[in-house]
Structures are given as structure tokens and as C-alpha cells.
């Protein structure tokens, strides 16, 4: 019998979408149905994934879908004995939303994406398929060049948009989590992310989503050398001292957690800007001891309302995503994280 039953173990559906498409050199998306089948097929010593997190956009989901269609999707997910956890709002330009530091029209698009996600979350909650999880957002401002032109003013624009988004979420009984990545302006370093979180100042509604791959590049100061906590050639002792410094700052805000691996590189595909490169769980070049690093983020997780953890491995080739061994290795890693740090 498994020694721990919480947090629940989820798989992300968006690796079937992110960086995929019909452009030159792109691979086609993998359908929600097939991603569910691949996830359901994974098994390690009789243990399975408990649920899924997913991105509320086409071709997986029309963010304007009718109640009837959304309930049909919930039934489809339930047919695999899965729960739904965290949902990704379509906040980016080219989906529904636009930059959180843009003009009034862009800001309204961003907020409309949050409203859509809250509506869908409420329908899933009412259906019974979703009993926990957050709605994931970020600044939706690709790159940091424009942000750098006036750091203080642009950070304030993001804070103001996030405050309005948090009020929308609160009215719907939902929580928002901003995912720190080096490619999103105002969220591209641990310090700038902390400035935004503290600027919003609504920890009960808007928190941080920590991803092991993306936060590794926070340590290295990839897009903010002035905030680097580590230099190349670091020792193991230096790594964990820096890791503790970063997690002590961001963990109190962390309400959603992505297990991931990174080899120290950045990667972009299709419409997705270069960001922390996700690697398979068993990648020999992985920089992270996944289980040990996860413990820094999952300390006191239950008290922050975390009820599940999710694997995130974006921009893998379809051949990797469609190989059963990929998901068994990931599930095995997730179980080891839960056995070490769960409850």
C-alpha cells in the first residue's frame, strides 16, 4: 500500500498543445482525449495518476464552450477516474487575453480570460470533477525588453491588472497562481516575482505557482543577472544554500506546484518564447535532484491549501509524449516526491 495519499498526483494536458501547431517545423497537437489515454495507461506498482491539470484553450477546450459541452468534457475526464485540479487561463495574446502591462484594451482582454476561466472552474466544481486547484496566470508579456524601459511603472501596471483579476477570482470562489518563468516580464526573476506578489498583497486569492525547471533558472539569474543566487560551476553545498534562500522567500506564497526537470538550458518552440527547458524525469543531464528540491517547496504545503502536485513537461517531441515508458517514469518520480514529502 502507498504510505501517503496526499498530495494527489496530476499530469498536465498542455504538453499536447504548447509549442505544437501547423507552422513550419512544428508537430501537430495531441488531442485532450489522447493525452487522457496516455495518462490513464501509466501505472507504477498498481499506483496511477489521480487527475489532470489543463489549459482552457483550443483544440483541447473552447473557452467559450457551453455549459453542456463543459459538462461533457468533465464526464470524459471522469470516465478515466480522474479529477481536475488547476486550470490555465487563456491570458496570452493570440488566445483570449493580452499583456497585463498593456493598454486598457489589452488589460480588459486579460481580465476577460480570467473571467472565462473562473466560469469554467465553477462549472467543473459544480459537476464534482474539481474539488481543489487554482487558476494559473502570468503577465502575458513576452520578454523583458519593454518592461525594462520603466521597471517600476511596468511592474505597477502588472500589479494593478493582477489585483483586478484577483477580485474577479475572489467573487467566483477561486484562487489565482502566477507562474514564475524567465520569459514573462515582471515575473522573470525571484525578486521581481516577489515584488509583484507583495504589490498585489492578496495572498488568500493570488499566490505563486512554483515549477522546478523554471525556478532553477531563477537561481542562475538567467534574465536578471543582478538577482542571481548562484554562479556556473557551483558546488552542491552552494546550490542548496541558494535554493533555501529562494524558497524561503517564495514558499510562503506558493499555492500550486509543478514537478519538473531542467538541464540548465532554455528552449522555445512554436509560439512559445524561450523559457526554462523541461526535460524528462529521468534525463541524465538533469540539474535537479527532483525529490530533494521538491521538499523545499512542499514544506507546510497542506497549510497553504495545496492538495495536489502536477508534472509539467512541455515542448517534448510527440514521439516522447506518445511513449508509455515516458509516463511511467514520470509517475514513478511523482510517487517518490509524495512518499518523501506528502501526508
Each language-model region and where it sits:
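N-terminal pre-domain/capping segments
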Residues: 1-131, 153, 163, 170, ...
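A cross-domain feature marking catalytic cores of carbohydrate-active enzymes
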Residues: 9-13, 53-58, 86-91, 136-141, ...
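Acidic-and-aromatic substrate-binding clefts and catalytic sites of carbohydrate-active enzymes
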Residues: 17, 26-31, 54-69, 93-100, ...
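A short, acidic, amphipathic alpha-helical segment used as a generic capping/interface helix at domain edges
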Residues: 37, 240-246, 284-304
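Active-site groove signature of glycoside hydrolases
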Residues: 121-149, 172-183, 310-311
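Acidic/histidine-rich catalytic cores of soluble enzymes
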Residues: 153, 159-277
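Aromatic-rich peripheral "rim/lid" segments of glycoside hydrolase catalytic domains that contact
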Residues: 273-275, 279-291, 297, 310-343
Amino acid at each position: 500500500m502507498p504510505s501517503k495519499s496526499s498530495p494527489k498526483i496530476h499530469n498536465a494536458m498542455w504538453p499536447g498543445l504548447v509549442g505544437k501547431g501547423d507552422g513550419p517545423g512544428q508537430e501537430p497537437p495531441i488531442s485532450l482525449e489522447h493525452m487522457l489515454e496516455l495518462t490513464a495507461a501509466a501505472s507504477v506498482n498498481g499506483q496511477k495518476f489521480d487527475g489532470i491539470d489543463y489549459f482552457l484553450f483550443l483544440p483541447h477546450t473552447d473557452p467559450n464552450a457551453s455549459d453542456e459541452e463543459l459538462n461533457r468534457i468533465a464526464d470524459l475526464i471522469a470516465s478515466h477516474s480522474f479529477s481536475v485540479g488547476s486550470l490555465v487561463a487563456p491570458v496570452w495574446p493570440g488566445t483570449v487575453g493580452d499583456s497585463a502591462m498593456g493598454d486598457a484594451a489589452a488589460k480588459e482582454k486579460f481580465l476577460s480570460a480570467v473571467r472565462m476561466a473562473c466560469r469554467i472552474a465553477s462549472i467543473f466544481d459544480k459537476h464534482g470533477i474539481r474539488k481543489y486547484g487554482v487558476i494559473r496566470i502570468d503577465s502575458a508579456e513576452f520578454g523583458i525588453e519593454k518592461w525594462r524601459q520603466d521597471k517600476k511603472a511596468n511592474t505597477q501596471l502588472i500589479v494593478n491588472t493582477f489585483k483586478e483579476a484577483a477580485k474577479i477570482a475572489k467573487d467566483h470562489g477561486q484562487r489565482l497562481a502566477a507562474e514564475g518563468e524567465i520569459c514573462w516580464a515582471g515575473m522573470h526573476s525571484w525578486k521581481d516575482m516577489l515584488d509583484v506578489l507583495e504589490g498585489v498583497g492578496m495572498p488568500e486569492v493570488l499566490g505563486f505557482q512554483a515549477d522546478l525547471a523554471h525556478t532553477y533558472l531563477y537561481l542562475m539569474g538567467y534574465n536578471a543577472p543582478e538577482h542571481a543566487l548562484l554562479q556556473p560551476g557551483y558546488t552542491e553545498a552552494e546550490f542548496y544554500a541558494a535554493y533555501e534562500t529562494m524558497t524561503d522567500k517564495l514558499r510562503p506564497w506558493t499555492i500550486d506546484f509543478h514537478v519538473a526537470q531542467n538541464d540548465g538550458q532554455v528552449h522555445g518552440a512554436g509560439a512559445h518564447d524561450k523559457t526554462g527547458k523541461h526535460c524528462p524525469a529521468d534525463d541524465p543531464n538533469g540539474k535537479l535532484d527532483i525529490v530533494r528540491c521538491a521538499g523545499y517547496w512542499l514544506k507546510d504545503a497542506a497549510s497553504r491549501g495545496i492538495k495536489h502536485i502536477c508534472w509539467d513537461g512541455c515542448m517534448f517531441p510527440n514521439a516522447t509524449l506518445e511513449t508509455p515508458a515516458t509516463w511511467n517514469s514520470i509517475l514513478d518520480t511523482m510517487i517518490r516526491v509524495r512518499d518523501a514529502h506528502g501526508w
